[in-house]
């Protein structure tokens, strides 16, 4: 691989490598390399997953522009954002303005809501899925310029929610932390993307492989390189028409092993795909997207790349056992390997 990289203050640099890893948020490198991929929900007929929709669509999960608030001990209420509508957030928690919640069985107290993401040093992470700052937009195929413009709306939506917390719920001493991100707007560099392109890999992991690993024709559990145990959790309530989608809130699954073949494109040599762009179904992405799994995917990708280069092998020729041994040598995650065996 040969890549041209514009290094800040150093001009254009050329990077050559035998193996490349796509760890982008939306699988942009995989697309540039010609890897096949899917976006949105497959149908029940495509994946044979019982909870998949009857027809495919291009709907992805809501994103969230997370904010970190800090208690300043004084009123730091921001000016009312343009277009602010408190009805958008009325049922983020139990309060007098909540009349018709979208999810009546998920209306928490405001104290539980604000402490959901409580951090040290009088700070609070605002990543609230229940009529909070989730925001629907499918920007996967947009240009960088289009994405930038679209994300301004997501940022604005989060600021509207911050104003709701301050003005409607009385948390007027909480404001954007000024010591977390070196950005002009005090927000993170990127939003939380819950869904990406999903490549066509050597294998495609789906819900059935997690629910009943030992009865499948493909014994994918034998090639496990990461484990997860979080329920299938999709965020869709900010999509207009979410009522017509499957109910994918905390669908229970057992602990599962993610197979190595999900990281390897089936038609492009020398490329490993990580993050949320691996070869999984839309449904099971609701659990493989979680950070503990994604961290393991990154470690597996690094181990796989190192072994391929060291042994002068193609990526799909590297032994999964050797990849696991590299994990074992790291010690901190060796217990995961035994769960996969």
Name each model feature, range by range.
Residues 1-3:
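Short, hydrophobic/aromatic-rich segments at coil-to-beta transitions
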Residues 6-341:
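Flavin (FAD/FMN)-binding glycine-rich loop and adjacent Rossmann-like elements that form
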